Amino acid sequence: MATIKVKQVKSRIKCPKDQKRTLDALGLRKMNQIVEHEANPAILGMVEKVKHLVSVEK
């Protein structure tokens, strides 16, 4: 499968708890942190949930 790079571009402060947990599950804990994941449906669903906080590169 293809891989995607996910970068946190906005702060998690004042976000609902479920969105904070989603960022944790993606491995994003700090601003401007980049993680690489396989583009499977589970990861893409998590990215969709926090799309206003992250940017995605293929």
UniProtKB/Swiss-Prot annotation:
Subunit structure: Part of the 50S ribosomal subunit.
Record's keyword terms, sorted: Ribonucleoprotein, Ribosomal protein
Species assigned in the record: Parabacteroides distasonis (strain ATCC 8503 / DSM 20701 / CIP 104284 / JCM 5825 / NCTC 11152)
Molecular function as annotated in GO: structural constituent of ribosome
Transmembrane segments: none
Any GO CC annotation of this UniProt entry: cytosolic large ribosomal subunit
Protein name in UniProt: Large ribosomal subunit protein uL30
Domain of life of the source: Bacteria
Alphabetical list of InterPro entries matching this protein: Ribo_uL30_ferredoxin-like_sf, Ribosomal_uL30_bac-type, Ribosomal_uL30_CS, Ribosomal_uL30_ferredoxin-like
One Pfam entry name: Ribosomal_L30
Listed HAMAP family: Ribosomal_uL30_B
GO BP terms in the entry: translation
Family affiliation: Belongs to the universal ribosomal protein uL30 family.
